[in-house]
From Swiss-Prot:
<keyword id="KW-1139">Helical capsid protein</keyword>
<protein>
    <recommendedName>
        <fullName>Nucleoprotein</fullName>
    </recommendedName>
</protein>
<comment type="similarity">
    <text>Belongs to the influenza viruses nucleoprotein family.</text>
</comment>
<keyword id="KW-1048">Host nucleus</keyword>
<feature type="region of interest" description="Disordered">
    <location>
        <begin position="1"/>
        <end position="21"/>
    </location>
</feature>
<feature type="short sequence motif" description="Unconventional nuclear localization signal">
    <location>
        <begin position="1"/>
        <end position="18"/>
    </location>
</feature>
<dbReference type="GO" id="GO:0003723">
    <property type="term" value="F:RNA binding"/>
</dbReference>
<dbReference type="GO" id="GO:0046718">
    <property type="term" value="P:symbiont entry into host cell"/>
</dbReference>
<dbReference type="InterPro" id="IPR002141">
    <property type="entry name" value="Flu_NP"/>
</dbReference>
<dbReference type="GO" id="GO:0005198">
    <property type="term" value="F:structural molecule activity"/>
</dbReference>
<dbReference type="GO" id="GO:0043657">
    <property type="term" value="C:host cell"/>
</dbReference>
<keyword id="KW-1160">Virus entry into host cell</keyword>
<keyword id="KW-0945">Host-virus interaction</keyword>
<dbReference type="GO" id="GO:0019013">
    <property type="term" value="C:viral nucleocapsid"/>
</dbReference>
<keyword id="KW-0946">Virion</keyword>
<dbReference type="GO" id="GO:0019029">
    <property type="term" value="C:helical viral capsid"/>
</dbReference>
<dbReference type="GO" id="GO:1990904">
    <property type="term" value="C:ribonucleoprotein complex"/>
</dbReference>
Amino acid sequence: MASQGTKRSYEQMETGGERQNATEIRASVGRMVGGIGRFYIQMCTELKLSDYEGRLIQNSMTIERMVLSAFDERRNKYLEEHPSAGKDPKKTGGPIYRRRDGKWIRELILYDKEEIRRTWRQANNGEDATAGLTHLMIWHSNLNDATYQRTRALVRTGMDPRMCSLMQGSTLPRRSGAAGAAVKGVGTMVMELVRMIKRGINDRNFWRGENGRRTRIAYERMCNILKGKFQTAAQRAMMDQVRESRNPGNAEIEDLIFLARSALILRGSVAHKSCLPACVYGLAVASGYDFEREGYSLVGIDPFRLLQNSQVFSLIRPNENPAHKSQLVWMACHSAAFEDLRVSSFIRGTRVVPRGQLSTRGVQIASNENMETMDSSTLELRSRYWAIRTRSGGNTNQQRASAGQISVQPTFSVQRNLPFERATIMAAFTGNTEGRTSDMRTEIIRMMESARPEDVSFQGRGVFELSDEKATNPIVPSFDMSNEGSYFFGDNAEEYDN
């Protein structure tokens, strides 16, 4: 990307920092995850969780959600102004699972938000540590990406279910900041913009007045974020058109959906970070590991190494397969929901299967599920190799206009071929090339038509042994050319519903 020099690395976005050198970045990311770990240990102490209970991923998620809720200013304000029956705006809580007489029991806990905020700040040297909160949001978002399908959401905004690989980060809250924007897929940004334009069409006052001015600023900011994800001049020029539109309407929606489709071949650059559950950082801190001193990176070997030595458990429903549950969480930990299964399988060292073949539901347990029959098992989160996470879409020639990988948004910087059926995709582009954006559309279609399926992405990049922390000896895997492995084929996952 040409503008690389002006961009902050994701670790800087993650930690809200200005430009820093590599060591400072590693230290500030280390400080962030260390703070999460200290907070988690403190919460486990207050809740009197045993070591085993503290390693239960469901307990980790309840604690993470409580702190996110405690710091959700906008929602807290809303709850105070619109009191609803039986909801205390000053409290937050959730299910904590404990082991009693060989059985798991669910206990609903309630906490003062103020108290949780105090505990969190204390663990983070008295600061609000927004970066740590965003980090937890991204972990939840990555888990949702691996667990649920967004077909309904896609169809509602006029997109096609086949665009599911563009939907990374679609469940991230609005308040997730620059680090959140970096991990959102092209489809997610398009969906947010389309929803906004639709509101403007239906509500005359949406763009008017003082509020409308703020709305307009938000609209243009979102357009710029999306523009920054595209890597070709024509796609960016179309985004300028959408952003500058006097009063955005159906023409802009058409343009955005066209751009989303084009991103199936001309991939956008979307960041990937390995964000782990709070309990993993807690375990490391408890064992005496000093994250800030050692430094930490979300895109290198560190998360792999951390998972190599962490034992995390999960509740398992009666007919779920523990190995499948492990795969789900492994994918979430490495932000690999949209990665090619061939690449994931190679790195993990065990076969990663498409979601349609998984015998497992989500990680979280609904409040009406029967605890009598719940069991627990160890999640297998270790890997055979490690690889560097990427923020490029895997386009081939000089990372510019060329074939990215259909139905895959690469997570790991690892060489792979791009088996794809161009015909299937180009079929989506018959139709409208007139209007203000006609020349750009023509140019984009031309680039897509010249994309060659036999190209190789991430040429020469490989995976590394876990002992090779300086990434000196890349092992370039060779994959079966014929089939690209998308996680979403034959999909029967549940929908994500708030």
